[in-house]
Amino acid sequence: MLITELRRSNFTLFLFPAATCDHARNMSSTSINGRGELNQLLRLAGPLIVNNLSIAGMNMADAMMSGRLGADALAAVAVGGSVWLLAFTLALGVLMAISPIAARYFGAGRPDMIGRYSRQGMYIAVAYGIPVVVFGQFLVGPLLALIGIDTAFRDLTTSYVGAIAWGAPAIYVFLALRFTTEGIGRTTPIMYTSVFAFVCNVFLNYVLMFGKFGFPAMGVVGCGLASAITMWLVALVFAWHIVVAPAYKPLKIFARLAPPRPEVLREIIALGLPIAITITAEVGLFAGMSILIGTRGTEITAAHQIALNFASTAFMVPLALSSAITIRVGQLLGRGDPAAARRAGGIGIVVCAGFMAASAIVLLVFPDFIVGMYTSDPVVSGIAVSLLLVAAIFQVADGVQIGAAGGLRGYKDTGIPMAINLFAYWLVAFPLAYLATITYVMPANFIWGAFVAGLTLAAVLLTWRFARLSRNSLTAS
């Protein structure tokens, strides 16, 4: 049924009936049919899925290899990684604004403007990266002391963050270049770079953490240093690729050293800061709910981590599709084809929902098998199975909300989505989770029910926002 609808040229009318037949008839000759649009989205998303899984693999490798050093080292990398994640997501969100901007200019046939925004994005990357280095070297220790972390564990965590922070300027410059590449629809180089990063990170972990090939064993410092070196290698390799690949020549990214342009910097930050706040709010929600569940005991906490890990892994696919939706919608709007942009967004949202529906079916049919891959503890297994059944409920909503968010970024609409997510996550989901936690009579799956409420509300509101905004764009055209 889904494929049949995707083949129809009036797919947008199927999803958003408010669009009129006149709008559909007025689509430009550059538009492609629903099946062709699906192929375009999957072509863009495929390499990004590999990229996301490679990043997840690096995090898993860090955890597994630091675990061989002992529980203290594993905990230090976990806590230090959370501190680093906060700094990383803030920059990630701001620099993500380059993707829809580049997509618009690419669709409009203005490669010179893409290069301008890419260069200014690198200024933002360096300006943000240097304070992160300073924070990692001098401020993490006092911060951990302030919240009461004991001295020995604090020293381990501080040394890890101090080492990984040296890579901040490089990884942020890479992000500026990566989102430029995304915007022009070249996602395959991103995939190759992420695989290269995974191999480098694991190899350098082995050498620096355990003292191989004549290097001293550095433990958690080696883990952080391996990540930092990998970040610099990735930035240099990707910059080299952009310099030598013919596809980037019209962009003239490195053709000259342009001074900072305040108006361009303001545009990137104004578009990207709401994205950064949205990502941070979502990361904060999951972290906060993990802390709340942690008050219920080790078995419930372990079960929560199992369910969250599987759900997060499945989320890598719609996350990549969301980026592909941003690219397609932005390019089609830049081309002056709002009807095709609306259709691309609608198809993307349905594909995200469809994949997550398939994931939900897997959770409903094979919960015991999935949990068995993580633990054999009967108590933890029983709780984890019940949480996976709740996770199956919010899978579709999670896919819809990330798909709609991707479409809205293509329209360069980030302020209202930020407000929607803050409301759904922190004024609905978290208070419900807190109430379920303090009552103690409610089982853990009631706490996870807060995920369902927040994500479902976000999905409904973001989809409504996309439908309205895309319809207004059609009317204006």
Predicted regions located by residue number:
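Short alpha-helical transmembrane segments in multi-pass integral membrane proteins
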Residues: 5, 12-45, 102-169, 215-273, ...
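N-terminal transmembrane alpha-helices
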Residues: 32-64, 68-69, 82-101, 126-133, ...
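Transmembrane helical elements of multi-pass membrane transporters/channels
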Residues: 43-62, 163, 174, 197, ...
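Helix-terminus/linker motif at the lipid-water interface of multi-pass membrane proteins
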Residues: 53, 57-75, 144-151, 207-218, ...
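Residue-level hotspots within pore-lining transmembrane alpha-helices
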Residues: 54, 58, 87-91, 131, ...
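Small-residue-rich hydrophobic transmembrane alpha-helices
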Residues: 74-134, 171-190, 290, 303-367, ...
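Hydrophobic transmembrane alpha-helices of multi-pass small-molecule transporters
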Residues: 86-89, 133, 201-205, 235-239, ...
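Short runs within selected transmembrane alpha-helices of multi-pass transporters and secretion channels
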Residues: 95, 99, 164-183, 190-198, ...
